[in-house]
Amino acid sequence: MNFLLSWIHWGLAALLYFHNAKVLQAAPAQGDGDRQQGEVISFLTVYERSACRPVETMVDIFQEYPDEVEYIFKPSCVALMRCGGCCNDEALECVPTEVYNVTMEIMKLKPFQSQHIHPMSFQQHSKCECRPKKEVRIRQENHCEPCSERRKHLYKQDPLTCKCSCKFTDSRCKSKQLELNERTCRCEKPRR
């Protein structure tokens, strides 16, 4: 069902795209410099800009080189092309499928000791795609057997370990003047 809805969704988007192709050719490729304040941006433009694709992103150098804490970098961040945007499905994430390295000259300062311009390598993303999120892949790979054929509603299951445990807690049972039977996962009358 989700597959069919996805195809319909993309079909409508393609139809809108081709229908408004002339409008897009006239629109600026990046930025809103030519737009008037208060002007409404068309759905197709908004949709296209939100798609999963490489976008210029400011990246903190310490994020890329976390072990070089003894230095101060100038500039402290660099503009890199990185995957960004929406995948229109919460089970998917925008990830790079093609990358390359770029070398930039960065000033490395060691307080009260030295400073020099040093070539540093950074990864840029050239192609991006929507792919299943890691936790979704793990859950799909580790498909668990059900806890119990009978009385499934009484159990909860950890999707990572497949361990089954009682859905009800002892405190919940006690609030009803009952006791939790851990073998059956039911709240029962206390034995006397």
From Swiss-Prot:
Disulfide bonds join 52-94, 83-128, 87-130. Residues 1-26 form the signal peptide. It comes from the Eukaryota. Glycans are attached at residue 101. Keywords: Angiogenesis, Developmental protein, Differentiation, Disulfide bond, Glycoprotein, Growth factor, Heparin-binding, Mitogen, Secreted, Signal. One of its GO terms (biological process) is positive regulation of endothelial cell proliferation. The keyword Transferase does not apply. GO terms for cellular component: extracellular space; membrane. It is found in: Secreted. The keyword Secreted applies. Expressed by the venom gland, and probably other tissues. Growth factor active in angiogenesis, vasculogenesis and endothelial cell growth. Induces endothelial cell proliferation, promotes cell migration, inhibits apoptosis and induces permeabilization of blood vessels. Belongs to the PDGF/VEGF growth factor family. Homodimer; disulfide-linked. Also found as heterodimer with PGF Interacts with FLT1/VEGFR1 and KDR/VEGFR2 receptors, heparan sulfate and heparin. This is Vascular endothelial growth factor A.
